Amino acid sequence: MPFDSTRVVHPDWAGHHAPVSEGAMNATVTVRTGGSPGGWDPVTGPTPGTPAMVTFTGRARITYEVLRGYGDRDAAGQAVTVRVVTLALPRAAPEQPAGARITVDAVDQNGPVELVARVLTVDSTGWSSHGIEQILTCRDDQSNQPQGGP
């Protein structure tokens, strides 16, 4: 039994162990929020959108969920496939909101190479149990990608 003046867990336990998590990160990503796609004016034609703001660029850990989380869906009479991707950002990264868009810029030999250049949408956010990293649950809508489907 420790003395009353001692702590079993260091007060900055997460800060001490965060480098281990960051060392296991297998991708480089860019996170954007806001922006609009533009629109259409019946008189003048296309209207410009507004660019999204980059809120984070750096290392992340990406894992594809084993099963199709969202599965196949129907959108306007077309079958679309949506997969769940879990993404972890470093402890020091700014907190990201649901709805943010993440572009996978690169992966290392331990990352899912099929996600390079894909755009993921953040569905939910949270922190690991000890605050070591920010956990984002993302949607990989395989039918609506800038470069087309898979």
Where are these regions (language model features)?
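N-terminal leader/capping segments at the start of a protein or of a new domain
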Residues: 1-26
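Short, conserved turn/kink motifs that form compact alpha/beta structural patches or helix kinks used as
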Residues: 1-9, 33-150
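Hydrophobic, regular-secondary-structure patches
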Residues: 29-31
